[in-house]
């Protein structure tokens, strides 16, 4: 029988927590404290439901805590008008103890694209920090208000087109705002991002990347040193694209570099971003690059290459092909032309392509078949599951999802996670079988 073991080191004492692979539930049940709902200025009532989550060891005890985002029931996509309730963040220990609550306030709109939160130990003190974009009226985990508590920049359509934007780093243990600076990439002229109603300008991404090969950075993105860890914040991906890298030394956030597709020589990088990004050392120099959809930004904040294939909804970065050096990228495209592409992550060279006259909205990659070397890949219009040479190894697979992959059952193959269902590809029968359903 397989047995999974997690060990925490407290001082010089080693403690064990064991969950047998055949445990009756196969999961931990963590109670949550649901925020109270409210009413918008238009009279619409809203409630809260748990949304995205991340993990980090915020107290240094060797056990992860969960940072949970609560979204109101009236959260909106950027394309839609309407007021929303405030976004709320909680931190929980695995036993359900709530450590803090952060209320983002009325000047941060609720929706999938607005608030990207990074949880990581950025200064090497053994405890994770939390970094995200904030606004006037954000209340930290100690009850302190950031900026002007009375400011309200929402217009009659519930959109936020004016007002200051901030980047805040929070203490992961207490939720205290340790430093707040002006957010870069700034909003500026809305039309630079593609429209005047913040559908394009308020699409954000973020990641953690080892830009010097040793210490992580935070990178904040908009639009589709020293010995400390760094982060990158991004804005925009349909038109203008800006990425800003930051270092945190335990006292100060310092900007490392800014990449802007509006800068001379960078126009090929505009409009290439996805709704997601990937991080990895694609050129073998020991430092992380940022694969920003159909382009890649080098670790020094310069452009590495652009395929110019434009925005897409999904992609995967890994060492797909064991017979080929380096990393590769599997992508799908919206442009009703390029379909699905498999490319060299270092150069952008297209290794193989399945063209399509449709918007290919999802693609997936995972090692699900032991009969073929490397990682298998498929998309909504890939004509089946492909191996690393582009050959179809299964033309139709019933129940094959295009959402997420997990290691679930203890073998070396991946399982697939879609909503509350874990499924496993049966390569002998050519179908996916459910192995866990969470009610």
PLM-predicted stretches and their roles:
Residues 31-43, 103-109, 177-199, 258-270:
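Surface-exposed loop and turn segments in beta-propeller and other repeat-based domains
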Residues 69-85, 132-162, 229-237:
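Short, conserved, GDST-rich strand-edge loop motifs in beta-rich repeat architectures
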Residues 66-70, 130-134, 218-220, 231-235, ...:
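Hydrophobic beta-strand segments that make up the repeating blades of beta-propeller
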Residues 61, 65, 125, 285:
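Acidic carboxylate motifs that coordinate Ca2+ or other divalent cations, activating on Asp/Glu
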Residues 1-11:
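Beta-strand-rich modules
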Residues 223-228:
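Short, small-residue-biased leader/transition segments that mark boundaries at the very start
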Residues 51-58, 115-123, 127, 205-217, ...:
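Beta-propeller blade termini
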């Amino acid at each position: 029988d397989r047995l999974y073991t997690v060990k925490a080191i407290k001082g010089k004492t080693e403690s064990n927590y064991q969950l047998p692979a055949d445990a009756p539930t196969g999961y931990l049940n963590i109670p949550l404290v649901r925020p109270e709902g409210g009413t918008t200025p238009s009279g619409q009532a809203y409630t809260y439901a748990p949304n995205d989550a991340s993990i980090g060891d915020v107290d240094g005890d060797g056990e992860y805590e969960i940072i949970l985002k609560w979204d109101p029931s009236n959260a909106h996509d950027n394309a839609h008008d309407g007021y929303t309730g405030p976004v709320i963040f909680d931190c929980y220990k695995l036993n359900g103890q709530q450590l803090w609550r952060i209320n983002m306030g009325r000047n941060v709109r609720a929706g999938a694209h607005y608030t990207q939160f990074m949880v990581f130990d950025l200064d090497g003190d053994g405890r994770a920090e939390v970094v995200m974009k904030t606004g006037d009226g954000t209340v930290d985990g100690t009850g302190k208000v950031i900026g002007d508590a009375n400011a309200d920049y929402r217009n009659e359509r519930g959109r936020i087109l004016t007002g200051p934007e901030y980047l805040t780093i929070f203490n992961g243990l207490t939720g205290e705002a340790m430093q707040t600076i002006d957010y870069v990439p700034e909003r500026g002229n809305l039309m630079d991002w593609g429209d005047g109603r913040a559908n394009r300008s308020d699409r954000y991404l973020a990641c953690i990347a080892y830009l010097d090969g040793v210490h992580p950075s935070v990178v904040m993105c908009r639009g589709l040193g020293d010995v400390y860890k760094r982060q990158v914040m991004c804005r925009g991906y349909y038109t203008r694209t800006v990425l800003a890298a930051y270092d945190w030394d335990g006292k100060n956030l310092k900007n490392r570099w800014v990449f802007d597709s509006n800068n001379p020589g960078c126009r090929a990088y505009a409009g290439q971003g996805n709704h997601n990004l990937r991080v990895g050392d694609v050129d073998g120099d020991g430092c992380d690059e940022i694969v920003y959809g159909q382009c890649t930004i080098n670790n020094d904040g310069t452009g590495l290459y652009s395929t110019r294939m434009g925005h897409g909804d999904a992609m995967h970065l890994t060492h797909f092909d064991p017979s080929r050096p380096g990393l590769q990228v599997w992508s799908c495209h919206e442009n009703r032309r390029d379909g699905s592409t498999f490319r060299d992550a270092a150069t952008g060279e297209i290794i193989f392509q399945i063209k399509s006259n449709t918007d290919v909205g999802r693609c997936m990659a995972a090692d699900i078949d032991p009969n073929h070397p490397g990682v298998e890949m498929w998309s909504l219009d890939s004509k089946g599951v492909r191996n690393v040479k582009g050959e179809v190894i299964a033309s139709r697979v019933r129940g094959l999802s295009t959402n997420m992959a997990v290691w679930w059952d203890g073998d070396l193959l991946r399982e697939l996670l879609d909503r509350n269902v874990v499924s496993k590809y049966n390569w002998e029968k050519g179908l996916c079988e459910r192995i866990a359903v969470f009610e």
